Structures are given as structure tokens and as C-alpha cells.
UniProtKB/Swiss-Prot annotation:
Region (Disordered): 153-185
The protein's name in its UniProt record: Urease accessory protein UreE
Function, as annotated: Involved in urease metallocenter assembly. Binds nickel. Probably functions as a nickel donor during metallocenter assembly.
Annotated compartments: Cytoplasm
Gene Ontology CC: cytoplasm
One GO biological process term: protein-containing complex assembly
Sequence ranges of Basic residues compositional bias: 162-175
Record keywords, A-Z: Chaperone, Cytoplasm, Nickel, Nickel insertion
Skewed-composition ranges (Basic and acidic residues): 176-185
Organism encoding this protein: Haemophilus influenzae (strain PittGG)
Main location: cytoplasm
Length: 185
């Protein structure tokens, strides 16, 4: 990490998980400042945020596969620890009972270009009313909940970039701008 001024470090690496670093004795009595992120911000390579105490922090995470997760530690000193807090958000939860049902759910949701997340045996995705209603109509028995989204399935996560297919399908006028919030203009 380079410090360009005393209040604006540029974070270039994730140092580890808060619990693991505490268990290793690398974090003891230092105060812990939190940087609150929405789930979709955790995948950005370049980001500027403020900790819960008002300290500005800039991120430049350029290594392939670097994604911020809840309780990631991004700064440690004798005086301070800065850790990530992924904020809970409204989600759709699916609990497929069989592997074919899981495959069908993931395939259908993938065709609608919504990011998918694994949470144990459940599939979660950002809440969107048209998607929720479609999943109900398709017989998937979705539930609405509030959770932290993590462990995105990378093959489906089309966040932040455009893409195309060799086939076409109808999104019935709905689309999103890389944030998972489906809507019509």
C-alpha cells in the first residue's frame, strides 16, 4: 500500500480475513474502522470510499480475481485496522431440492443475465420484483430475504461489462445497468 497523504491510502492488496488475522495475533488491540460496500461495489477494481470514522480510502485492486469480501482486512498498522463490511441487501433465495432443479434454476436465471451467488445449498440473487414474479410463475418457490451477497458464480457475473450471445432471447423490455436492478425505461 502506498500512502499519498496521511488520510488517503491507496489499497492495492487484501491482507486476509479479520477473524484469521486476529487468531494469528496480527490484530490485537488496534481499533477497527469499517468500509461499508454494497455487494456490486465489491467487484470494482478502482474505488474510493470513506470509513465509518470519515477516513478516505482509495482502492486499486488490479490483480486478477481480487474481489473484496466481508471482513477482508485491507490495512493493518500498530494504530489502526481497516476492514470491509459488505452491507446486507434484499435478495431472492432459491432452495433447489435436486441437482436438475438447481441446474434449471441457474440456467434460467443466467439467461436473464442476473448475477448468481451461492450460499450453502441455496442460490441467491439481488432482489428484483419482475425476476421474483417470474421465478414464482416458473415454479421455483423463491423467498425474499436480507443477506450479504458473496461467492458470485463467475461464469454468470456480467457486472460492469457488455456482452453478446450467438443467440437471441427476449427480456420482455427489462434490463439492468450492471447493478442487478432490472427495470424498463
Amino acid at each position: 500500500m502506498k500512502i499519498i497523504n496521511p488520510i488517503l491510502p491507496i489499497i492495492e492488496n487484501i491482507l486476509g480475513n479479520l477473524t484469521a488475522l486476529q487468531a494469528e495475533g496480527k490484530i490485537t488491540t488496534q481499533p477497527i474502522e469499517r468500509i461499508a460496500l454494497q455487494w456490486y461495489e465489491s467487484e470494482r477494481n478502482i474505488l474510493r470510499k470513506t470509513t465509518n470514522t470519515g477516513r478516505e480510502v482509495a482502492f486499486r485492486l488490479l490483480k486478477e480475481g481480487q474481489r473484496l469480501k466481508h471482513d477482508d482486512v485491507v490495512f493493518i498498522s500498530d494504530e489502526l485496522v481497516i476492514a470491509i463490511e459488505i452491507l446486507p441487501s434484499e435478495v431472492i433465495v432459491l432452495s433447489p431440492k435436486t441437482l436438475p432443479e438447481m441446474a434449471r434454476a441457474c440456467y434460467e436465471i443466467g439467461n436473464k443475465h442476473s448475477p448468481l451467488f451461492l450460499d450453502g445449498d441455496e442460490v441467491t440473487l439481488p432482489y428484483d420484483k419482475p425476476m421474483f414474479e417470474w421465478l414464482q410463475a416458473a415454479g421455483f418457490h423463491p423467498q425474499k430475504a436480507e443477506r450479504r451477497l458473496s461467492q458470485a458464480l463467475r461464469a454468470n457475473s456480467a457486472q460492469g461489462h457488455g456482452h453478446s450471445h450467438s443467440h437471441s432471447h427476449d427480456h420482455h423490455g427489462y434490463h439492468h445497468h450492471g447493478d442487478g436492478n432490472w427495470h424498463k425505461h
